[in-house]
């Protein structure tokens, strides 16, 4: 079972809900829930086959790119820098699973 992947998905999902409660951005909530769902489904697929990392890798790369740009623009660690950093760690972990 890919507990790290499921934890990453839960963090993304929880973060989108928390962001919605603080700022009220409906589109941000929908996008965050969708990306969290993709990360969770990717973790489920990795749980069944350790080499099936395509969806998880795509999701982490997408989130690292989007949040990395936001972090570069805002220079704020929370939430953009944290999510970008965690996404980069997920990418590294998933690549190592392929080796």
Swiss-Prot record:
Organism domain of life: Eukaryota
Entry's transmembrane regions: 1-21, 24-44, 79-99
Coiled-coil spans are none
State the annotated membrane topology for this chain.
Multi-pass membrane protein
Q: What is its main location?
A: mitochondrion
Q: Give the location in the cell.
A: Mitochondrion membrane; Endoplasmic reticulum membrane
Give an example GO biological process.
Answer: negative regulation of mitochondrial outer membrane permeabilization involved in apoptotic signaling pathway
The Gene Ontology CC terms held by the record are:
endoplasmic reticulum membrane; mitochondrial membrane
Gene3D superfamilies for the chain: 6.10.250.1330, Transmembrane protein 14-like (1.10.10.1740)
Q: Which InterPro entries match?
A: TMEM14, TMEM14_sf
Quote any Pfam family the record assigns: Tmemb_14
Keywords (alphabetical) are: Endoplasmic reticulum, Membrane, Mitochondrion, Transmembrane, Transmembrane helix
Question: Would you identify the family this protein belongs to, as annotated?
Answer: Belongs to the TMEM14 family.
Protein's job = Inhibits apoptosis via negative regulation of the mitochondrial outer membrane permeabilization involved in apoptotic signaling pathway.
Could you tell me what this protein is called?
A: Transmembrane protein 14A
């Amino acid at each position: 079972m890919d507990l790290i992947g499921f934890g990453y998905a839960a963090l993304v999902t929880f973060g989108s809900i928390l962001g919605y409660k603080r700022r009220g951005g409906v589109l941000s909530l929908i996008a965050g829930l969708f990306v969290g769902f993709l990360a969770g489904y990717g973790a489920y697929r990795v749980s069944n086959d350790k080499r099936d990392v395509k969806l998880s890798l795509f999701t982490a790369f997408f989130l690292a790119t989007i949040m990395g740009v936001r972090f570069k623009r805002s220079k704020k660690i929370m939430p953009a820098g944290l999510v970008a950093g965690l996404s980069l760690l997920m990418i590294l972990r998933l690549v190592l699973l392929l080796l």
